[in-house]
Amino acid sequence: MSGDGIPSLSVGDASGISLAIVASTWHDQICTALLEGAQRVATEAGIDRPTVVRVLGAIEIPVVAQALARTHDAVVALGVVIQGETPHFGYVCDAVTTGLTRVSLDTSTPVANGVLTVNNEQQAIDRAGLPGSAEDKGAQAAAAALDTALTLRRLRQPWA
């Protein structure tokens, strides 16, 4: 795990940003921890009530993220895909990653990919922001989405 080089998660005042979070319920303890990390960063940035939508699995995340990206300034996608014994893992990971990237580019809305793609459950726990976890990918994804939304807002302002 590369925890080296993690930037500050403080994004400053994002109170004018509308944030949505879509999180799967598969591996619920881990996904709920990711969601809590994202919500904590949102609160620290001045967003008291981000829109939260729960979906069953990771493969459902991109289409819901697309709907949310049409009505929000930033979207955070959270979930867990754990390697199994079949090629299904690769298909799901590719579909989710490609789907989220496409949504972000097609809508010009930041969609932060906080979907963990790991070899085993312990790797997911280590990244979920649970007690004893080395990282909090939910918090990191929220910070990335908010920071990018603020950057895009500045870039879109007419030059005086």
Swiss-Prot record:
Pathway field: Cofactor biosynthesis; riboflavin biosynthesis; riboflavin from 2-hydroxy-3-oxobutyl phosphate and 5-amino-6-(D-ribitylamino)uracil: step 1/2
Active site residues per record: 88
Record has Transferase as a keyword: yes
Entry GO terms, CC: cytosol; riboflavin synthase complex
SUPFAM superfamilies: Lumazine synthase
CDD domains: Lumazine_synthase-I
Annotated residues for binding of (2S)-2-hydroxy-3-oxobutyl phosphate: 85-86, 127
EC number(s) from the headed UniProt entry: 2.5.1.78
Family: Belongs to the DMRL synthase family.
Record note on quaternary structure: Homopentamer.
Name of the protein this chain belongs to: 6,7-dimethyl-8-ribityllumazine synthase
Originating organism: Mycobacteroides abscessus (strain ATCC 19977 / DSM 44196 / CCUG 20993 / CIP 104536 / JCM 13569 / NCTC 13031 / TMC 1543 / L948) (Mycobacterium abscessus)
